[in-house]
């Protein structure tokens, strides 16, 4: 036989089909053996570059389902021994060209004896009483390699060279078994060994009932992936995984939802999807009673109770509950930023960050609040915003009892009690409680001002400053005093103004007891007690306790007239005189609630 000989094979040449009655009479061991051999045969054919056949059959083989249903459309025969040629309605293997050395040649003997004579049945209308099916494997170098590979997975379930595994099929009867072995061949011996023995992994000590399962498990430790996809080169440790993967390339989605028509390439994906329609949540937490649709979500939730974090970063030792979280974290160490914006070229280490960034260019805010109409880029932002309307504050501080509507706000608050300042500046060593404050501080060293006003070009280091500045151009004053109707463009200005009506002075000097409306006024006042004069004139060295006083003094050196014109035709009045007059008319307390900028 030439090494390059090619033959055409149909699915019937390598498959064995059963009726529902026949399949029901097989015991568990016989079914398992059949399914494993069929799966391995399929994987072998795929590794040789053969086209993918029906994914339904692969799924049923892999999940131990009723195989007579998977193959009943391939044959009209009621039993395997029927001499009538099966009528194939939809062949799954169509003219597969294979090397002859690796073909499984099914030989139906025509006798009840070993000399292949056709046995005569007592009932001529039924099937023959004795039929011997010999499964013989051709001899050749390619066959030897494949046989060795299969034997390593099944502990010698394949036959030796030239040895025929003989299984005698008796007449089908509802009273007896379908198959009876007349001799202990290699297949039977292997099954007996697997029944009696257990197989233990030397790496982790895990025990398996079958050697095939042990071999598959050991690939976790050895990282061996012998099954390679011919389309993309991706490798797999199991042939079934390769078969499932190949459906991605074919684009076939045979599992369709009857409710909405959505299709899937795996039955398990369809099952999970159908729970959306049924509302089924089969995975319930025994700790808190919360139920979940998917097992993976349930496992992650359960770790929140146990505190288990099995995924540990080898670089910094940080642990994570799930693998995606670990992968996202690890990119920090590698510095990789694979997600790049096509508009401006900015790169990100997470896809979600790129998505958020792209909304700056598009301006899309698809998530709108039903209460106030405010729109958001992310659904999570909308959910957090909605708590403002409900007033719910589920996150409570155990130290002081203060409640918050966000977990992050609670964590930030708790640092007040612990004194923790995890964000330290590498330039000056100053530490900060909040990351946002730390980022703003770093910009004082770098001089970065990323927020620029489109109207006047003025740049700011903080986004909030840009928003406050922009109201100057719009003239908008959304903050109105309910007492007098005066409007302001900043909420802080409204707060200061309202203290005129309330007379509230929350900032009190601990030295003399004098109270102030603003903390800035208290700070300036406290310098009187300390005697500190931090503002020094560079010309003469004279020091002052206020910046405004230094500015007024420097006019002496510059020769600038320190007077202001109040009105045309009226006499000049010095700034100090103006202050004295205002003190007489309005009182000193009024000056404490006005800014120095307004005085000059």
UniProtKB/Swiss-Prot annotation:
GO terms for cellular component: nucleus. PROSITE patterns: KRAB, ZINC_FINGER_C2H2_1, ZINC_FINGER_C2H2_2. Keywords: DNA-binding, Metal-binding, Nucleus, Repeat, Transcription, Transcription regulation, Zinc, Zinc-finger. SMART domains: KRAB (SM00349), ZnF_C2H2 (SM00355). May be involved in transcriptional regulation. Its main location: nucleus. It is found in: Nucleus. InterPro entries: KRAB, KRAB_dom_sf, Znf_C2H2_sf, Znf_C2H2_type. GO terms for biological process: regulation of transcription by RNA polymerase II. Residues 110-121 have a biased composition (Polar residues). This is Zinc finger protein 543. Disulfide bonds: none annotated. It comes from Homo sapiens (Human). Belongs to the krueppel C2H2-type zinc-finger protein family. Residues 9-80 form the KRAB domain.
